[in-house]
Amino acid sequence: MVNYKELGLVNTKEMFAKAVEGGYAIPAFNFNNMEQMQAIIKAAVETKSPVILQVSKGARQYANATLLRYMAQGAVEYAKELGCEKPEIVLHLDHGDTFETCKSCIDSGFSSVMIDGSHLPYEENVALTKKVVEYAHQFDVTVEGELGVLAGVEDEVSSDHHTYTDPEEVIDFATRTGCDSLAISIGTSHGAYKFTPEQCTIDEKTGLMVPPPLAFDVLKAVEAKLPGFPIVLHGSSSVPQEEVATINKFGGALKAAIGIPEEWLRESAKSALCKINIDSDSRLAMTAAIRQTFAEKPAEFDPRKYLGPARDNMEKMYKHKIINVLGSDGKLSC
């Protein structure tokens, strides 16, 4: 067994407490490969932000659990090389669906795990989450639970519809499970196709599609039931239209890809909603840069020549999110 402290990682407990008190959110960026990790760490160090390196079950299988562990350790050392003596980096399992998956991650150095039992009947969700919490807390690993179901598709996570979190359940769930944070459903969705055009209205000034409002009343009700308790929002990519346009310009076929307006996320981050998950925006930034490079340099076959621009574009996006959306910049002394 490898404990996350041996890798120089931290859990989310103190990080979330500071974010709730300070009115900002911690960026939770999903990653699958070295270029994404490099971009995330460089952006976090240069903006002096704590950060969560988030890995789905599918990404862990793709990258290999052993290599992933060393990448996480390397991320800490890379941050120090970049000038941050005391980086705050979490390695988090996103959407763990079984106790065995969560245990495997805890045993291999993860500092935080999510157990997603939201698809189960309520009592089964409580029992599964509690089981993970009891194991994780032995090793000071923090646990994220979930109430409510998000629509959309992302890796193995798939649902045709969303179910809002019931505020009347949150006290019982948090108390009985002992979870350290709670992911809720207020209308966001996984993936780049969060809403259909029929669900949206057209902004007369910009001509862009505006999605239906999120259920902020649910968020407020949850906060009222659990004052100061760390709340998590999944499916929070904004799907930048400039990246979508670049992808489509150079041979892509992303039609009606619509995300969450960034101003909604910034307002949410001022509450107890202290962890905001972003995955699709990273994929879009990477894909846009790669497609553009291939179109402009069709003879190019050196991976460094197209993955380098992809890394730079992702870093730019991560910095923007940290500074302008989440407000977590400047929160580290480094």
Task: Report residues per predicted region.
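Shared catalytic-loop signature of beta/alpha-barrel
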Residues: 53, 60-64, 265, 274-298, ...
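Short catalytic-loop micro-motif centered on adjacent basic/acidic residues
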Residues: 26-30, 91-92, 114, 231-233, ...
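Extended, intrinsically disordered, low-complexity segments
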Residues: 289-334
